[in-house]
Swiss-Prot record:
It comes from the Eukaryota. PANTHER family: 30S RIBOSOMAL PROTEIN S2 PROKARYOTIC AND ORGANELLAR (PTHR12534), SMALL RIBOSOMAL SUBUNIT PROTEIN US2M (PTHR12534:SF0). The lineage of its organism: Eukaryota, Viridiplantae, Streptophyta, Embryophyta, Tracheophyta. GO terms for cellular component: chloroplast; mitochondrial small ribosomal subunit. Keywords: Chloroplast, Plastid, Ribonucleoprotein, Ribosomal protein. One of its GO terms (biological process) is translation. This is Small ribosomal subunit protein uS2c. The keyword Metal-binding does not apply. It holds the Pfam family Ribosomal_S2. Its main location: plastid. It is found in: Plastid, Chloroplast. InterPro entries: Ribosomal_uS2, Ribosomal_uS2_bac/mit/plastid, Ribosomal_uS2_CS, Ribosomal_uS2_flav_dom_sf.
Length: 238
């Protein structure tokens, strides 16, 4: 796989607080190769390792996007849910940022039924169909549509399970990771000092609590995806 320069700057990473891990009591020994030192009871991540894995992840998503592959970005912690949505929309990716519903990937046929229901209700709302119903029935359907928009709005155009899943928090998104493992879907996951790097295909050692850290990493990944998508569209047009 040809490597590109993704302009991964260590000073910028420090400014974003990517190097701050959890308190030393919370660590997972499997993260030892990615820890640089300990400072005042807090583990400090080795940003050289972070840069290495992030560059590898950017190469992967660039080449996948260059082949027209589809991506899903997952991050349901309230601190970063808006970042997940904005990054995914910018890179034309699918996303889940409110709650991972069990079976979202492993029970895809049921999810397809829900997405079809979502589309039907949305069409009915857009064409004034609710206005022709009794008030009580219309209110029930509007509530259903609101719930579907909240939880499935980021995947409403996803017609098949994704080719690659990007995950912002290993512990919070453990169900999503298990489903990806069961289906053999490659994952890229931010792993803090209390995580298990063996559970993901490309672990990115980084602070998974700070918005600035997640934003910086997402910006790099979505830029690489966008670059790959641009190449893909050019090749289709030629």
């Amino acid at each position: 796989m040809q490597q590109k320069n993704w302009n991964i700057n260590l000073e910028e990473m420090m400014e974003a607080g990517i190097h701050f891990g959890h308190r030393t009591q919370k660590w997972n020994p499997k993260m030892s190769p990615y820890i640089f030192t300990e400072r005042k009871g807090v583990h400090i991540l080795n940003l050289t390792q972070t840069a290495r894995f992030l560059s590898e992840a950017c190469d992967l998503v660039f080449h996948a996007a260059n082949e027209g592959k589809q991506f899903l970005i997952v991050g349901t912690k309230y601190q970063v849910s808006d970042l997940i949505a904005s990054a995914a929309i910018k890179a034309r990716c699918h996303y889940v940022n409110q709650k991972w519903l069990g079976g979202m990937l492993t029970n895809w046929s049921t999810m397809e039924t829900r997405l079809q229901r979502f589309q039907d209700l949305e069409n009915k709302a857009n064409t004034g169909g609710f206005n022709r119903l009794p008030k009580r029935e219309a209110a029930i359907l509007k509530r259903q549509l609101s719930q579907l928009q909240k939880y499935l709005g980021g995947i409403k155009y996803m017609i098949d399970p994704p080719d690659i899943v990007i995950i912002a928090d290993q512990h919070k998104e453990s169900t999503a990771i298990k489903e990806c493992i069961n289906l053999g879907i490659p994952t890229i996951c931010v792993v803090d000092t209390d995580c298990d790097p063996d559970l993901t295909d490309i672990p990115i050692p980084a602070n998974d609590d700070a918005r600035s850290s997640i934003r910086w990493i997402l910006n790099k990944l979505t830029f690489a995806i966008h670059e790959g998508q641009s190449n893909y569209m050019l090749s289709k047009d030629s």
